[in-house]
Amino acid sequence: LKDYFDTGFAQNHNVSVSNVTDKSHFRASFGSSNNKGVFPNEKLNRINLDLNAGMEMNKYLSMDGKISLSRTKAEDRPYFGTYGAIAQLMGIPNNIRLDDLKQYSTDGNAHVNWTGPTAGIRNPYYVLNQRHNSDERWRAFGYYGMKINFTDWLHLSAKYAFDYYRTRIEETNAGDGINGESSIKDIT
């Protein structure tokens, strides 16, 4: 199995800048995360940007707000369940060497398998190289707030918050022969 899997790797980078005075505050941060999974071609990358600021305009009025933006992109997340790579690996008899299955296709159409092309179990290299997926999510959320002080003991405050996201999911499966399939979903 060690020849089938890769060594996973993750790295994270963050930087932030802030300033605080007696009448205002400001903070900006940026983060980046890059991950490579244990399956070949498996990746997950994320970028985050946060801005937060507030100010006391005078003794009666103050405002503050925050916005966070993020983008997450994943490629070839592992499939789970019956047709995922792990289930296919578990179905391999002990007398079959994984090296013998690396050439998973004879002519680009039919996949090579120890059980024959019509069985429910697929060559794990076929699953790895012919079933692909990717997803990308953009997200923005935050708030804007205002506070009005009428007296030392009476004030009015209001906040507006939002959360918006858009996700795009793509999946392809080569199938056997001309029976391939592909789908694209946009979710907002």
Which residues make up each language-model segment?
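Transmembrane beta-strand segments of Gram-negative outer membrane beta-barrel proteins
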Residues: T21-F30
